[in-house]
Amino acid sequence: MVSSWRVQQAAREIRAGAVIAYPTEAVWGLGCDPWNEEAVDRLLAIKSRSVDKGLILIADNIHQFDFLFEDFPDTWIDRMSSTWPGPNTWLVPHQNLLPEWVTGVHDTVALRVSDHPLVRELCSLVGPLISTSANPQGRPAARTRLRIEQYFRGQLDLVLSGSLGGRKNPSLIRDLATGKVVRPS
C-alpha cells in the first residue's frame, strides 16, 4: 500500500510522541502511541479524562493484536474475526501485557479493528493506536473539524484531514468472554 503524504506525516508525528485527531467511522477520535506514556498522559489531560478509565486500541488488522491472544481459545479469535474490520469493540483480557496507562484499573482492554480507510492506513504504518472520542470529558464527541478546533485549539500536534465514515453511533462494545453487550451502538 502506498500511503498518502498526510498519513505518512501523521505516522511520523505519532512516532515522535504526538497527540493527533483523526476521523473514524462515526466521530472524530484522538490518538497517540499506546507505548508512549508521555503522549498518553497528554491525551488524557487534553480530554480531562482519568487514567483509571482505560482506553481503546485500534488496529489495521487482527494480527496487530496477536501479542495479546497467545492463550486465547480459538472460539474467541473466531468471535472477534467475524466482526472485524468493523464497528465492533471487544473487551479482552490484557494479561498484564499492556501498560496501566492504557488499561486503567481494568482486567480487560478494549480492542477494535477499524474499517475506516484513513485509520487503517495509519495503523498499517504505526501499529495499534490509542483511540478515544475527540471531546473534553462530558461534552459531545466532535463530528466536524471545526468542533475539533473549538474543543482543542492549540493542544493537538496534528489534525489528520478526512471524512467520517458515515455511521451515526460509536462502535458496539462487547465482552469477549461472555459475548454480553456493554455499550450498544
UniProtKB/Swiss-Prot annotation:
| Known EC number | 2.7.7.87
The reactions it catalyses are: L-threonine + hydrogencarbonate + ATP = L-threonylcarbamoyladenylate + diphosphate + H2O
Q: What is its main location?
A: cytoplasm
Q: Which organism is it from?
A: Pseudomonas fluorescens (strain ATCC BAA-477 / NRRL B-23932 / Pf-5)
What does the function comment of this entry state? Required for the formation of a threonylcarbamoyl group on adenosine at position 37 (t(6)A37) in tRNAs that read codons beginning with adenine. Catalyzes the conversion of L-threonine, HCO(3)(-)/CO(2) and ATP to give threonylcarbamoyl-AMP (TC-AMP) as the acyladenylate intermediate, with the release of diphosphate.
Query: What name goes with this protein?
Result: Threonylcarbamoyl-AMP synthase
PANTHER family, alphabetized = SUA5, THREONYLCARBAMOYL-AMP SYNTHASE
Q: Which UniProt keywords apply?
A: ATP-binding, Cytoplasm, Nucleotide-binding, Nucleotidyltransferase, Transferase, tRNA processing
Which Gene Ontology terms of cellular component type are present? cytoplasm
Q: Give the Pfam families listed for this entry.
A: Sua5_yciO_yrdC (PF01300)
Cellular location(s): Cytoplasm
Q: Which residues form the YrdC-like domain?
A: 4-185
**Which protein family is it in?**
Belongs to the SUA5 family. TsaC subfamily.
A GO MF annotation of the entry reads:
ATP binding
One annotated GO biological process: regulation of translational fidelity
Provide the top EC class.
transferase
